[in-house]
Structures are given as C-alpha cells and as structure tokens.
Amino acid sequence: MPRSLKKGPFVDGHLFEKIYKAKETGDRKVIKTWSRRSTIVPEFVGITVAVHNGKKFIPVFITENMVGHKLGEFAPTRTFYGHAGDKKSKVKGKK
C-alpha cells in the first residue's frame, strides 16, 4: 500500500541535512548512508550517495528518473549466481 499523499515522502533527517549542505557548498563528495528507506526527492538530483547493501557501500548517482523511488532499490542486497544446471545433459554430451 503506498504512502498517504498528505504525509509526503519520507527522508531521514540526517541524510537530508547532509545533502542540503553538499548542494549549498557545491561539495562533490560521496555521501555515505545506511538509510535505504529514504525516498529520493528532487533536491537529491546530481548528488552521489553511497547506499549500504548489508556488506558494502554501493555508489549511486541520482538522476531525475530516480525521483520518487527509494534509495535501497538501487543497491541490491542479494547476489544471484544462476540456477543449477542440468547434470544429465553434461553426462549425455560425453558419449
């Protein structure tokens, strides 16, 4: 269920302050955050945020297309190694 429009988007306060200061001073440093739950708002566009995926920080450059999404959507937490192969076909090919 989506968030109520009257509440507005959720952004962690400490993250918003860091991004506001970076925009104000023109600082291009990467901002580290554990706040995967924060919504990307238009003020974030042009900033690089390093989002924690549970193991390491993934740098995410924020563009206009990302506005309205959550930061966590751009830092996957799971690694997909593929499904197990068919063992019969390997044996069959050896004939």
From Swiss-Prot:
Keyword field contains Lyase: no
GO MF entries: rRNA binding; structural constituent of ribosome
Alphabetically ordered keywords of this record: Ribonucleoprotein, Ribosomal protein, RNA-binding, rRNA-binding
GO CC terms, sorted: cytoplasm; small ribosomal subunit
SUPFAM superfamilies: Ribosomal protein S19 (SSF54570)
KW Chloroplast (keyword) present: no
An annotated GO BP: ribosomal small subunit assembly
Transmembrane regions listed in the UniProt entry: none
InterPro entries linked: Ribosomal_uS19, Ribosomal_uS19_bac-type, Ribosomal_uS19_CS, Ribosomal_uS19_SF
Family named by the database record: Belongs to the universal ribosomal protein uS19 family.
Role, per record: Protein S19 forms a complex with S13 that binds strongly to the 16S ribosomal RNA.
Stored PANTHER family: RIBOSOMAL PROTEIN S19P FAMILY MEMBER (PTHR11880), SMALL RIBOSOMAL SUBUNIT PROTEIN US19M (PTHR11880:SF8)
Name under which the protein is recorded: Small ribosomal subunit protein uS19
